[in-house]
């Protein structure tokens, strides 16, 4: 968890609002230790949207590594039928787990940087422009075809995704500038551990971030991709990364074999039932009431909230996300 102070609503039980939970400190107290896995756009950040949550969050830098995709969200008025024409409401813009977490971090009052390989096509330029407008510093090589993800959203807000990651998995260790890893927290999309050379880039990024005293977190991402990759093989990838915090939904949690042993702190995303945090203490927080328009990106908003301000901010950010169409604030 980023080194920050959170002030505002009632503190979590057992700590004041300005304390950093000990379970979220880096594995190595001096910032080094693990062998495996800056925002300059201040002008853009002043114009970026902010989500009204807590009164004061000291500015920290959350760096993410993974995908910066073109996100096409299709909210269906009725179920699809082969050969038929179904009504829908659509929205397109920047997406991808790494991009989403960085954008939400900025919206919640932090600084956000996203490390990703981007396409040099129209989709890539659109994504880069939108992230910049949101105050996110997008860094990494550009070339080839940008990834696109299509999310089909039903009336209940649940989504089904079709993902084309484009050039994103081609990010290599040699593409990294150590300056990008001067941050408070490095958040790695689990998709980055499912392909090469981006997995090696993730491990190298974690090394560099820890040299700067940062914590490292990972979101296990899609259980279907983990199943295809091999759960035991994927778990080994996470173990090599040695994260301080692991995020997972319940399906991902189960398929990897209960992720608690993978990190000092585990955050289980339970949808409408809220969040479960396992560390030195067990903490359950319910989801906040409200209409669910679109669940796309809710887990990313939750992760950003947790890294910036802890569990309370996590559930608030998730509630903000599901109340609108699209994955970004």
Model-derived regions, located:
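Polybasic, low-complexity intrinsically disordered segments
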Residues: 18-42
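Short, positively charged and aromatic/hydrophobic N-terminal segments
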Residues: 23, 53-57
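Glycine-rich phosphate/adenosyl-contacting loop at the front of the ribokinase-like
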Residues: 56-115, 122-129, 149, 289-292
